Amino acid sequence: MAGLAVNVDHVATLRQARGVDYPDPVAAAVLVELAGADGVVVHLREDRRHIQDRDVRIIRQIVQSKLILEMAATPEMIGIALEVRPHQATLVPEKREEVTTEGGLDVVMHKDSVADAIKTLQAGGIKVSLFVDPDLNQIKAAHKAGADVVELHTGDFCESRSPKAMAAIQEAARLARKVGMEVHAGHGIDFRSIQDFVGVKEIQEFSIGHSIVSRAVFIGLDAAVKEMMALARQV
């Protein structure tokens, strides 16, 4: 039975499209929690394309479950995290030209800087997750760097729905749990593809945003969150 953390970035995307102050992702965070979600996720990107600094600060003050801050491992973002103190920081790679995060963090390549970021955040009382591709070398590197959690990038599977991509996720999840890390999963998961994860018991929590916000346009945020939460609980 997996948990569900809901990403409200795309509520902010809609707001920023018109440069107005609505819809407010802060209000969305409240509704997400009232619907029963296990946490709220926001990605404060360096270019501030959707979530803004004030969103992070206000959501941190009002959230009753947990706030997960997705962020690049830059001095600026680490400083903000230490000030805001989210319940969890998820380190992700970032490219300004990408529409959304395109791949996992290369912990093997950047092991020293990632380990330093993890140490700094943990010293501030923040649990640290690394968003990584389902690759065994990345899992081993994440563990060696000191991560508390790995969030497995599920984008390849959600695009292809291939048995090979699912097998990679299962293998990575098993290894991560074996070495003592929590296992989360996210990216590209919708109301159909989440059902393919039934039986992957190593996954403890899903991080999902776009598909929930998209469904909410038609049936409302409360109903969309509850529908996805029911599916996550079956995993």
UniProtKB/Swiss-Prot annotation:
Protein's UniProt name: Pyridoxine 5'-phosphate synthase
Reaction(s) catalysed (UniProt annotation): 3-amino-2-oxopropyl phosphate + 1-deoxy-D-xylulose 5-phosphate = pyridoxine 5'-phosphate + phosphate + 2 H2O + H(+)
Organismal lineage: Bacteria, Pseudomonadati, Thermodesulfobacteriota, Desulfobacteria, Desulfobacterales
UniProt entry keywords in alphabetical sequence: Cytoplasm, Pyridoxine biosynthesis, Transferase
Location of the protein in the cell: Cytoplasm
Database matches in Pfam families: PdxJ (PF03740)
Pathway in which the depicted protein is active: Cofactor biosynthesis; pyridoxine 5'-phosphate biosynthesis; pyridoxine 5'-phosphate from D-erythrose 4-phosphate: step 5/5
Disulfide bridge map: none
Protein family according to the UniProt entry: Belongs to the PNP synthase family.
Enzyme class: transferase
Superkingdom per UniProt: Bacteria
Catalytic center residues: 43 (proton acceptor), 70 (proton acceptor), 187 (proton donor)
Record-linked InterPro entries: Aldolase_TIM, PyrdxlP_synth_PdxJ, Pyridoxine-5'_phos_synth
Molecular function per GO: pyridoxine 5'-phosphate synthase activity
Main location, first listed in the record: cytoplasm
Any one cellular-component term (Gene Ontology): cytosol
Record-listed 1-deoxy-D-xylulose 5-phosphate binding positions: 9-10, 45, 50, 100
Gene Ontology BP term (one): pyridoxine biosynthetic process
Subunit text: Homooctamer; tetramer of dimers.
Swiss-Prot/TrEMBL site (Transition state stabilizer) positions: 151
EC number: 2.6.99.2
